[in-house]
């Protein structure tokens, strides 16, 4: 057995809720530079045609993007928007991941045998609900990560200022910009991520290929990360472009997607795929492994507290 041993008592909803948020924050701390590189690649060339964009591309590849940012903006630029990112994960992952099992049990009426339909429904529900809670933090995070593209001056100087400026200049709706594509994205991401993780893990355990410990969690998380990136990349690119856009640049998320297709072609929807996969794959591994261990550690601590002397 590698890591904390599974406890006889299943983790409570509170343990899952807090564990998911904490694990997601740890994963974000480790993988945030990859997410920033992904955002820069996704918004690159959005106001140019495909030929002009290719000729004038500032960022080329994951490593090239990171090195260019470090050289031109300094190492701290890789973590621009981290505060909003951690705020987002604590509120976002707690809901979409921490409540997944509870919602799944609700849809199956407490049965331990959940079909794919129930899992997909639970993933869609918690993914959409999480967006409703955390959308403003996502808007601020994306804008901080992208703001070097906005010109010589920085768009926002601090996280608090960003919230205030967006609310003042764009109204309440500005903080919820991109909610529609984000709901779609996170319903898809949650289904792909959590359901794939669930299914891979169940298959490995039922086939006795692995035991319920770190190697199993690592393999399941990595597979889930790849599947999620393939499925969710097009919606993710539209979400990033739309949330980062200036007031009036796009009339809707659909208009943003149509403009991308007309100006840059279908390949634009997979811009930043490699950093997306590297980020989501590594994020999934760190998050799920940490989450599984946190659940066990918290339940073990609770059991030791309640044990008689």
Swiss-Prot record:
Q: What are the recorded GO MF terms, alphabetically?
A: antiporter activity; chloride transmembrane transporter activity; GDP binding; L-aspartate transmembrane transporter activity; malate transmembrane transporter activity; oxaloacetate transmembrane transporter activity; oxidative phosphorylation uncoupler activity; phosphate ion uniporter activity
Q: Which PROSITE patterns does the record match to this protein? A: SOLCAR
Q: Which reaction does it catalyse?
A: L-aspartate(out) + phosphate(in) + H(+)(in) = L-aspartate(in) + phosphate(out) + H(+)(out); oxaloacetate(out) + phosphate(in) + H(+)(in) = oxaloacetate(in) + phosphate(out) + H(+)(out); (S)-malate(out) + phosphate(in) + H(+)(in) = (S)-malate(in) + phosphate(out) + H(+)(out); malonate(out) + phosphate(in) + H(+)(in) = malonate(in) + phosphate(out) + H(+)(out)
> Which InterPro entries does the protein's record reference?
Mit_carrier, Mito_Metabolite_Transporter, Mitochondrial_sb/sol_carrier, Mt_carrier_dom_sf
Q: What does this protein do?
A: Antiporter that exports dicarboxylate intermediates of the Krebs cycle in exchange for phosphate plus a proton across the inner membrane of mitochondria, a process driven by mitochondrial motive force with an overall impact on glycolysis, glutaminolysis and glutathione-dependent redox balance. Continuous export of oxaloacetate and related four-carbon dicarboxylates from mitochondrial matrix into the cytosol negatively regulates the oxidation of acetyl-CoA substrates via the Krebs cycle lowering the ATP/ADP ratio and reactive oxygen species (ROS) production.
Q: Where are the transmembrane segments?
A: 17-40, 78-103, 120-145, 174-199, 218-242, 269-294
Among the entry's GO cellular component annotations, what is one?
A: mitochondrial inner membrane
- Share what the entry says about its subunit structure, partners included: Homotetramer. Adopts an asymmetrical dimer of dimers functional form. Interacts with MICU1 (when methylated); leading to decrease the calcium sensitivity of MICU1.
Q: Name one Pfam family in it.
A: Mito_carr
> Would you kindly state one Gene Ontology biological process term found in this protein's UniProt entry?
glutamine metabolic process
Question: Which keywords are on file for this protein?
Answer: Membrane, Mitochondrion, Mitochondrion inner membrane, Repeat, Transmembrane, Transmembrane helix, Transport
The feature of type site (Important for inhibition by GDP) is located at: 141, 185
Q: Where are the Solcar repeats?
A: 11-106, 114-203, 212-297
Q: Which loops or segments lie on the Mitochondrial matrix side of the membrane, by the record?
A: 41-77, 146-173, 243-268
Q: What is its main location?
A: mitochondrion
Stretches assigned to the Mitochondrial intermembrane side = 1-16, 104-119, 200-217, 295-309
The encoding gene is UCP2
The record ties this protein, via PANTHER family, to:
MITOCHONDRIAL DICARBOXYLATE CARRIER-RELATED (PTHR45618)
Its UniProt domain note says: The GDP-binding domain is located within the hydrophilic cavity, with GDP phosphates likely forming salt bridges with the charged residues, Lys-141 and Arg-185. The long-chain fatty acid-binding domain consists of an hydrophobic groove between peripheral transmembrane helices 1 and 6 near the matrix side.
Q: Where is this region: Important for interaction with long-chain fatty acids?
A: 16-63, 278-285
Tell me how this protein sits in the membrane.
Multi-pass membrane protein
Cell compartments where the protein resides: Mitochondrion inner membrane
Question: Native species of this protein?
Answer: Bos taurus (Bovine)
**The protein, known as:** Dicarboxylate carrier UCP2
Q: What family does the database annotate?
A: Belongs to the mitochondrial carrier (TC 2.A.29) family.
